[in-house]
Amino acid sequence: RHNEIVHGKTNNFTMFGSITLNKVVGGINPKAVDVALRLGAKVVWLPTQSAKNHMQKMNQDLSQCVEVVKDGKIVPELRSVLELIRDHNAVLGTAHIAPEEIFTVVEAARDMGVKNIVVTHPEWWIVGMSHEDQLRLVKDYDVILERCYAQNMGGGKYKSNLADNLELIKEVGYKNVMVDTDGGQTENPHWELALAEYMQYLVDHGIPEEQVYH
C-alpha cells in the first residue's frame, strides 16, 4: 500500500512492514506480534537496543533488558511468537542477541516449523559472530545471513564491511546471503548509493552478476 499511495505504482519497489520486540512494545509480546502480522507486517525482529547482549556490550542497566533465552531454552513467550511467525509465513530476524542465543533460537524456530530466518548483521561487533559459526548456521539450519554495507563502531564512526562480506559470500555461497546497507546515517552515503557501490564491489571482485542480482 505504501508504494501504491506514495508512488502511484510508478516503480516496482515493494516495502514490507515489521515489528521489533524491544521494551517499548512489551518485549517478547505475542499480542503485539499478532496485531502487527494481521496488519500486514512480514518481518519480526527480536530485540535490538533492548537485547541483553546489546545492553551488556554497551554497559547499560540489564534490569531493563529483554531476554529471549533463559537456562539454555527460549522463554515461553518466544514460543508463542514463533508459532505466529510460522502460521503467517513471516520472517524471523535475530536482531542483536548473542551468538549462543542465536543458535538456541534458530534451533527452536526450525523445530517449530519457521521457514524464513535471517541472522541479523552477524559481523557487527555487538553481535560478534565468527565466520565459523555463521557457516555452521547455514550448514545446519539453512538460514540467511544479512551482511551490511557498513557497521557502527560507536561515536559516529562506521567501518566498511565490503571486503569481509566478499570473503564470506565466497565461502558460504550467494543463496544464503542477503545484502543491505543498514544505512540512514549522515556518515554514510544514501542507501541507494551505498547499495549500488556494494553490488559493484562484489561484481568487480569476482562474484558473477547473475548471483549478485539474484
Language-model features and meaning:
Residues 192-214:
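Mid-to-C-terminal alpha-helical segments outside catalytic/metal-binding sites
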Residues 15, 44, 48, 92, ...:
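Divalent metal-coordination and catalytic microenvironments
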Residues 30, 75, 130-135, 158-166, ...:
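Charged helix-capping and loop-helix junction motifs
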Residues 83, 88-160, 178:
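Catalytic pocket-lining loop regions of alpha/beta-barrel enzymes
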Residues 18-24, 47-51, 97, 122-125, ...:
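Active-site beta-loop-alpha junctions enriched in small/polar residues
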Residues 11-12, 22-120:
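Extended substrate/RNA-proximal surfaces in nucleic-acid metabolism proteins
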Residues 174-191:
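Short acidic/histidine-rich active-site segments
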Residues 2-12, 34-40, 83-86, 109-110, ...:
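Acidic (Asp/Glu)-rich catalytic clusters
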